[in-house]
Amino acid sequence: MKILVTGGTVFVSRFTAEYFAKNNEVYVLNRGTKSQSEGVHAIVCDRHELGDTLKKHEFDAVLDICGYNETDVRDLLGGLGNFGTYIFVSSSAVYPETRSQPFREKDEIGENKIWGDYGVNKINAERFLMANCKNAYIIRPPYLYGKMNNLYREAFVFECAEQNRPFFVPRDGKMRLQFFDIEDMCRFMEILLEQQPKQRVFNVGNPESVSVIEWVELCYKTLGKTQEFRFVEPNIEQRSYFPFYNYEYFLNVEKMLELMNETKSMEEGLKQSYAWFKDNRAEVRRKSYFEFIDKDLRG
């Protein structure tokens, strides 16, 4: 297949481009500000200034990894020539935090006060796409992790483990987190392209969540380390020392499992993530968690 991937230089879009390039002809659309992956064809252009750049291409699939709002989708659709299937990577942030959980695809979407404009913009992008593209799919992942993850999430815990630090846990550490390995997401997009199911919107993610404590234990275990926990009172801002908001949610992924009944174990996914991290530390966008911990929590 001839596939267009938006982005292609960082984490989700880069992994996606390299994953599909193994067996397909892959083009990436980006502004050329970062290094390009080997084995892909780079189209260096702003998605908002496409002109006729893409008109000469006929893509079997468009994987829109970097669409964040209605304008992003509108401008890309307007710049494309003929194409087959359009897959838009949306987010769990489209579900209001006030709705009962687990969230299902049929549930009404709306503003989530935790995610704010990010979720609202994804909603507007989804609606424009479904109104203007006949063969489109939308996937809504929870927290993505795995190889090439440049966000300071598991990488932060890995560094705590490397330095034999105690880990500072929000409250009692029982808040649950739902993850999805980036390779599993690519596998599912591949299934959508191959099987073309009638359903158009899918929640994706691991069928089971983990508590904060369980997640940290898994990260330390990846390095063969045992963690020591320190529990932090709720009056201290959680994002000052921990990579996730104080917000627990869960996506129902039964429809995904009907098409892809196995997902990668967290143990395996974290092992692959750490192997990448060790060789690509400079790629990670660090936050000042250590500074806050050392100044305000350890003292």
Feature roles, as predicted:
Residues 126-148:
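Conserved beta-loop-beta element that borders a ligand/cofactor-binding pocket
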Residues 148, 176-183, 202-222, 264, ...:
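Substrate-binding strand-loop-helix patch
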